[in-house]
Design a protein with these regions (language model features):
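Short, low-complexity cationic-aromatic patches
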Residues: 51-54, 248-255
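Well-ordered alpha/beta subsegment
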Residues: 235-250
């Protein structure tokens, strides 16, 4: 019995998911303009982990025919995983986060990437719901990274994009990357004193935010100031502060609020004073991009 038979996976097309994936890639020139095919997975996994297990099963099923994904990622709506070839790309995504359903489609690679690049370049107001994805990870970098949206024009926009990304990671990472972490640093460089804030989402643990406070005063007043802003834990050896949040929508919102508050307290006047650095996932291999965050990348050294 094959893995797919054992999982009893079917699709609305009447084909098994591996057969459907192979069919879409084989007949891509005639299928590339067709609407996505809704997938059905039976039996439905237990409710608490149904979304994660359903996604893993679907990824494994498509991989039987097309090999492992070339691009992992997710939008504000749900996961978007891709099997990219030079001519066409098969896409596994979710049309509705509330429903948790999955669908499979194929699109011409060049047209898809040009269209998405245009959407990122011309994004206004950083409405993350209108963007094709918020994060994308290539285990083996083969595709050109997408352009980033313009820098957030104010703190409200940046907070919204941070919250959307962190919420997506809290919901999507485990189903795609297992127990691997994803992280990035935000650097504030004012008065020639770069200050670094680290954001980490771990499927095995929590949503963690750390800030370098080595130039902070060693006093009760400063300690009270930091805890008043929302920091929970001082690490004396390294002189960093940490705050830890549940991997939920509420946790993502609280973390985004703390990040914005701390960046302003560290001297940033606008999001243009920030730089994005050390973006990575897992053991650091591959390429993780965050095109919808609204923070300029770090300048080359």
């Amino acid at each position: 019995m094959t893995q797919t038979d054992d999982m009893d996976i079917a699709a609305s097309s009447g084909l098994s998911i591996p057969d459907l994936a192979a069919h879409l890639m084989r007949t891509a020139p005639t299928e590339e303009l067709q609407p996505p095919v809704t997938l059905g997975i039976r039996p439905v996994p237990p409710l608490a982990r149904s979304g994660i297990e359903r996604l893993r099963q679907a990824i494994n099923a498509v991989s039987e025919s097309l090999g492992p994904p070339t691009l992992y990622g997710g939008s504000a709506v749900g996961p978007t995983i891709r099997w990219r070839a030079p001519s066409h790309t098969v896409i596994l995504d979710s049309p509705d986060a509330a429903e948790g359903g999955l669908q499979l489609s194929v699109r011409r690679t060049e047209a898809l990437e040009l269209s998405e690049a245009d959407r990122f370049r011309h994004a206004t107001g950083l409405d993350t719901a209108d963007l094709p994805f918020l994060w994308q990870w290539q285990p083996i970098p083969t595709a050109p990274p997408p352009p980033s949206v313009p820098v957030a024009h104010d703190w409200t926009s940046l907070r919204a994009s941070l919250e959307a990304l962190l919420r997506a990671w809290c919901e999507q990472l485990e189903g795609q990357l297992g127990q691997d972490d994803a992280c990035f640093d935000i650097v504030v460089d004012t008065e020639g004193k770069p200050r670094r804030l680290v954001v980490l989402v771990s499927p095995a643990d929590s949503l963690t935010v750390l800030v370098d406070d080595r130039d902070g005063a060693d006093s009760d007043d400063h300690h009270a100031e930091m805890t008043g802003r929302g920091w929970q834990d001082f690490i004396p050896l390294h002189r960093w502060w940490g705050a830890y949040f549940e991997r939920t929508s509420a946790g993502a919102a609280a973390a985004a609020e703390l990040i914005g508050t701390e960046l302003r307290a560290r001297g940033a006047q606008t999001p243009h004073d920030l730089r994005l650095a050390d973006v990575g996932a897992g053991e650091g291999h591959g390429l993780l991009t965050l095109p919808a965050l609204g923070i300029a990348p770090a300048l080359p050294r």
